[in-house]
Amino acid sequence: MLIGSRANFMFLVHNESVGSSFTSPRPFRVNAGAVHCYTLSPDGNTKYLSELETGSEVLILNSKGKARRAAIGRCKIEKRPMLLIKAKVGNEIGGIIAQDAETIRFVKSNGKLVSVTHLKKGDSVLAFSKEASGRHFGMEVADEYILEK
């Protein structure tokens, strides 16, 4: 899923299809991050993670950009340790607050996965970025400009 703290800058967050010493693979699950983060809907609008619920449709992407719709089967909010991760694409800077856990992975530009617990300054991960514009209730407003920090 594309997830980020800004509507115009989102990180490709991988599902939990890779097991760890703590858990079995759970390919149906995406640990998306803090509830204030945005995700991209199949219709091109954004939604806050806090707005998602069972039955909500979200956009699922692979590392090559191929997208499909998926319906949420279960949505849960938990209190967990979190990390702030920032990145830059051109002149745009974006961030995400993600759970501090080895099972949370981003996708590198070569298609390989990297856990947020192993990210290092200078690592390159896949992200969606475009010039900032205004949004109102998730819909892009073409004649507005908003600077988010």
PLM feature segments, named:
Residues 66-87, 137-149:
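Short, compositionally biased
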Residues 44, 57, 63-64, 124, ...:
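Short, surface-exposed secondary-structure boundary micro-motifs
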Residues 1-31, 83, 87:
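Active-site loop ensemble at the mouth of alpha/beta enzyme cores that anchors a bound cofactor
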Residues 45-48, 115:
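Short, conserved secondary-structure segments in the cores of folded domains
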Residues 84-136:
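Glycine- and charge-enriched low-complexity intrinsically disordered segments
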Residues 49-53, 119:
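Short, well-ordered loop/turn sites that connect or cap secondary structure elements
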Residues 27-40, 92-109, 147:
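Short, basic/aromatic beta-hairpin or loop at an interaction surface
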Residues 50-51, 60-61, 67-72, 82-84, ...:
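Extended hydrophobic-aromatic, low-complexity segments
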